[in-house]
């Protein structure tokens, strides 16, 4: 998982199943790699990195994290290597998310939480990057929407009621005291919503 320590390019949460990061680097096309780094890592230099990976893998497959870090360092402009954070951070994040299908897991976890919450129960979610936070934000917003009919309809025809009420009008970020105690919380974002007494779609 780490770009700071040389290790096998696996990244699977469950080593018994699924493709490894090395498999993705070997099998995905240059375009698919660039899309992956851009979508899941929000990597500015996704195309350059994907091109460099494909060029290098024709000579030798990627097996170790140090090899990938070296490729990334040589693929991006020199000033970007000394910006905030490690230059390989976003690519490693993208690979980890893809290998473990993490965003799907977030979506499924939110749906499961909604099903088991009783009226008045609260769902508090801490995410650590913008992709997760976006999913949480949209999920809570959609659950809090009382009607999904087109705005030009004169009356509501869907009969939908809001199943959640958003408690945090804005995302909650850690304060200075929290960061002093726990510097790793710097990227965390908290959102909270409360279950209403409206039935879910399957129960209506």
Where do the model's predicted regions map?
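S-adenosyl-L-methionine-dependent methyltransferase catalytic core, i.e., the SAM/SAH-binding region
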Residues: 1-204
